[in-house]
Amino acid sequence: MSSKSELESLLNKIVKSNDETEVSKALKEIEDNNEYIEKKQLRSLLTMHDKKFKDQCLIPMNNLYVKYNDIVGKDRNLQNETAFVDRDIRVLESTLQYIIENKNSHNTNHGGCNKTKNSSKDKLLDK
């Protein structure tokens, strides 16, 4: 039993010891370095990066925005205009398809009897 109590007392002495060991010195140095890195170096690195980012990216982009903003402002309704053009194209395609189908059904119903030679309408519809 004395060996168990002796081990516990040695363990308590080691755990509660105020004496610095090589390991505790290394740990303290690591913690101090970490604090220095986070408080000093990281902040200066972020500041430097922010300045570089602003100089290389943000300021040129802002200059382009200022330069071309008036041109873009005139084209704000471009999407609406393209929607109207797209709609008109679809209407024309549907109309042309309807005419072609109507012509084909007319020719099959009448056997092509009413067809005139080289009619300009037929040439247009054949295209």
Curated annotation (Swiss-Prot):
Protein known as? Biogenesis of lysosome-related organelles complex 1 subunit BLS1
Which keywords does the record carry? Endosome, Transport
GO BP term (any one)? regulation of protein localization
The UniProt regions of compositional bias labelled Polar residues, in chain numbering, are: 105-117
What does the UniProt function comment say about this protein?
Component of the biogenesis of lysosome-related organelles complex-1 (BLOC-1), a complex involved in endosomal cargo sorting.
Per the record, its GO cellular-component terms are: BLOC-1 complex; endosome
Family classification: Belongs to the BLOC1S1 family.
Q: Is Isomerase given among the entry's keywords?
A: no
* Oligomer and partners: Component of the biogenesis of lysosome-related organelles complex-1 (BLOC-1).
Q: Where is this region: Disordered?
A: 103-127
Localization, UniProt: Endosome
Q: Does the keyword Metal-binding apply?
A: no
Q: Where would you say this protein principally sits, based on its record? A: other
Q: Which domain of life is it from?
A: Eukaryota
